Amino acid sequence: MKFRAIVYNSATLNAPKNILQFLFGVVIYTSLTGDYNILKIVIAASGLSMGLGAIYLFNDLTDYEEDRKNQMKISWKAIANGSISVQTAKYLILILSILGTLFSFLSGTNFFVIFAAIIALNLLYSYPAIRLKSHKNSSLIVITLIQILKFSSGWFLFTNNLEGFPYPFVISLSVGYALLFLYYKNNTTNAKTIIRENKKRVYPLSLVMFLFLLISFFMYAFPVVFLLILGMSVPTILFYTLSKDYLGTKVNFAFMYAGLIIILLSFLLLSVPTVTATNDTLLGYSTQIKEILKHAYLNR
């Protein structure tokens, strides 16, 4: 195995993303309850990363011939570019599978069930005999479900109670991820062309995403988070648009990580007194708006 393959492979490059998605649930739970367990978080995050690392390498094995012809992917698809041999990849898949399963099992029943569901859905997506990734609609549904489970995993590491869990926001994030995934699968060549060719998927998913985002704004007690996300996302998206033409498609990874960090940072800022006070003020306005809408509906 070549030295560059330690970093430039699907398992390593996707590990930070999976950890950030896992930490989303942890941050939400901790911000609401104040409870956390560092050791449990580290073990669970390691288990999820290793288990998914095995899946990514398995996926690369099944896509070996296809990836060799893809100029966008070849630089970081270590099996396709020869940085990792097929035999080494098989050993890594076995080791990561065992360690990922063990660490996830040690993290508790709730987390292990979610871990098992994530792995099962990924196998449905990639396994040659099933290969749902070949079906346009089914693949997006599976990808969305996987993201819902990953964003939820950190929460259910500590509890099986849904009270306070922002599931509409999680659904919105997961659908948004599925849309970005569709963009990525088409090699990020031309957004307008991708939207036009996939409008039967893009438009309904976009509607679902914004609908659940709107529901989240009125249902949960952190409206300032949505404003922070919006405020930090606009310049990030602008920078992405300007830099993509100069840096190429590799900037997509940086943009994806920036988006996840923005979301986590926005929730973490709720611990700052000034931000908390602003959130309470916005929450009061939100309550007033809901009362006005309620009275308007009842007096029709």
Regions found by a protein language model. Give the residues of each.
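Topogenic membrane-insertion module of multi-pass membrane proteins
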Residues: 1-72, 81-94, 117-121, 125-126, ...
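C-terminal membrane-associated helical module and adjoining short loops/tails
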Residues: 3-8, 12-15, 148, 153-300
